[in-house]
């Protein structure tokens, strides 16, 4: 898993998306890729948790309405945060049996494929002038790490969110907007642990991505964006003490998470925030998709979010996209799907359910709700993304 950072310029949003994973098949044989190829569209993805699975189905429903003759072969890769998808896809590509398309973070995560010419240039077939004009410019740049457009971004997630149960914090007398930096959050955890019966922070340690994500926000909150960008750029000289400090604070945080953290998924942990058994959750804003689908759990009155302490003004982002592998078993169906994924209709259906904002600027925000509309304003006003 790559280290997530603030996206911008040519740097990718190659952090981690959520999901508890589910076992899927290891792929299906495609056609020979000649002419239109197979009418089966095989999609490898990792969207298997409740809210994200609903969003994925909303995307497929819209595609089926426009292309009812295409048979979709749904192939979720097992493992949280896409932890298994690279192995699955790379093995398939090496064996000459690529899927029709697969989910991937644009930016640096694409380079192992573009370096080996394993992705088709879709600059003419998919990225027409209307689509290019509608997309946010820095997101378009992520789709062409080697110059040619090879991916279609479909969403933008923010990672440095600190979600909380409003009534739990009200009862404890905690104002999350007053928390002063990552160290201040530890003090709040200590207070909650000593004075209440709730778990201070919902969290999973079954797979490492949630803790890595949390460490990144701690580091940015303590040291700032410039130090973080230096670190992920490979220049670690002079940052050893800063890295150790963030790791120590992460270890301190993990004293205040659920006892069963090692056996649960992120969304199972998030249920504790919904039920009032946990106060906080550090997670990407896909967590909001779960809140949206919960009964009688409303934004601002029941749950809310502040930027992780110390990271106000930073939109630490991760973006999902789909690509067109070379040797494609279903070139016509894949092109149709990528065209749809980049459309207003697809992004209007998918993102409100997913808990993400659209990379197109012309998607109506009416169905996104107050939280995602606020996130979109945060994105536009952030000084680092």
What annotation goes with each model-predicted range?
Residues 6-112, 116, 128-131, 297, ...:
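Conserved N-terminal structural module of periplasmic/extracytoplasmic solute-binding proteins
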Residues 93-104, 118-120, 195-199, 275-283:
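Alpha-to-beta junction loops
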Residues 123-137, 141, 178, 201, ...:
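Short, solvent-exposed loop/beta-turn-alpha elements that line the ligand-binding surface or hinge
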Residues 65, 144-214, 222-261, 271, ...:
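Helix-loop-helix "hinge/cap" segment bordering the ligand-binding cleft or interdomain interface
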């Amino acid at each position: 898993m790559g280290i997530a950072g603030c996206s911008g310029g040519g740097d990718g949003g190659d952090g981690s998306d959520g999901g508890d994973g589910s076992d899927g098949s290891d792929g299906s044989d495609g056609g020979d890729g000649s002419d239109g190829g197979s009418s089966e569209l095989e999609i490898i993805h990792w969207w298997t948790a409740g809210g994200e699975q609903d969003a994925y189905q909303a995307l497929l429903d819209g595609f089926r309405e426009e292309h009812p003759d295409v048979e979709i072969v749904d192939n979720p890769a097992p493992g949280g945060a896409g932890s298994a998808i690279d192995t699955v896809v790379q093995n398939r590509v090496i064996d000459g049996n690529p899927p029709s398309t697969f989910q991937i973070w644009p930016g640096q995560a694409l380079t192992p494929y573009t370096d080996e010419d394993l992705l088709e240039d879709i600059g003419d077939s998919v990225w027409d002038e209307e689509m290019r004009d509608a997309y946010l410019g820095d997101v378009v740049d992520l789709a062409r790490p080697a110059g040619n457009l090879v991916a279609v971004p479909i969403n933008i997630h923010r990672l440095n969110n600190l979600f909380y149960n409003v009534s739990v914090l009200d009862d404890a007398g905690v104002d999350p907007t007053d928390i002063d930096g990552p160290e201040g959050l530890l003090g709040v955890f200590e207070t909650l642990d000593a004075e209440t019966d709730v778990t201070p922070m919902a969290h999973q340690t079954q797979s490492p991505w949630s803790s890595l994500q949390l460490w990144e926000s701690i580091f940015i909150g303590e040291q700032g964006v410039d130090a973080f960008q230096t670190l992920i750029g490979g220049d670690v000289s002079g940052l050893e003490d800063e890295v150790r400090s963030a790791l120590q604070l992460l270890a301190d945080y993990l004293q205040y998470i659920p006892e069963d953290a090692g056996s649960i998924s992120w969304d199972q942990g998030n249920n504790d925030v919904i039920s009032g058994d946990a106060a906080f959750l550090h997670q990407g804003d896909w967590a909001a998709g779960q809140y949206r689908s919960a009964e009688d759990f409303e934004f601002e009155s029941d749950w809310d979010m502040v930027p992780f302490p110390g990271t106000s003004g930073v939109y630490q982002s991760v973006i999902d996209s789909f690509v067109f592998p070379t040797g494609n078993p279903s070139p016509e169906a894949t092109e149709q799907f990528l065209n749809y994924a980049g459309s207003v209709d697809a992004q209007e259906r998918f993102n409100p359910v997913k808990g993400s904002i659209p990379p197109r600027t012309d998607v109506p925000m009416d169905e996104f709700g107050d939280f995602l509309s606020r996130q979109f304003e945060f994105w536009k006003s952030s000084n680092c993304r």
